[in-house]
């Protein structure tokens, strides 16, 4: 967890980065450092740090040969060793970011760099470099009062509480590529991120969050895509497995792959199929997954949002299933020529 209760924003720079495909260019003023009064510092501290307060998903800068060749790593390294270079290095970052802004969805906007001191990350004192690319601006109403009347003005400004594209780089794990966290709400989940993949060029740290997240995805993919065809499971069976998979991650502090396999799949054929799929999955994605680790509840909460325990019947009915596979029966009515579900229950609301 990130504690910024005593944090100080000692340097703050601003430039403007446009969309390269639209030839909008980059604006780097001769003086990128912005002097801040106390209230502005307080607003920026909250805007740039609060979104990362409870994050457990961390990354390192990545380079195929050596991380010391990574351009952003080099720039951050320079700033951490000499914060006085913030202004010059911020201009270099803006130029690098512009080269990555070719997606038509990327809007031109301010690019901020903040240098934060007196932070605590998991109880360890750290300094950090914050990067914030403004994607959208909002309209604000401002009233002015006089003895006779009020006047109303519409101002264009940056929403301080909505980070859509940002990163926070900490001055720890320098040899590995600096520990950092990142936000990108612009790119879709299944598409390449201009921010994470092209500009930051990062790789996830292989920790408890990483293992929990990927085992949930692995199990979900097996249950919803592989098992129905290989093991002949219907929609009710797959929902039951998804629910029991969720219960395992929510109810246990430690994950053990064999315990999970035998708890979730009662038949040996199912267990063998899951073990085989796990091997295929880890090889296909080059994932060095652990067999035993502490479960990250933040990863559980985030990942299980994507699994839908819903049986959709034509366009008329939806059945939400949260457990008790034994209370649902599926069949076929010969007389009506239609499939049916029978649900047993004790009370209704």
Across the structure, where does each feature detected by a protein language model lie?
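Long, hydrophobic alpha/beta structural blocks
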Residues: 1-303
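C-terminal, beta-strand-rich globular interaction domains
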Residues: 275-349
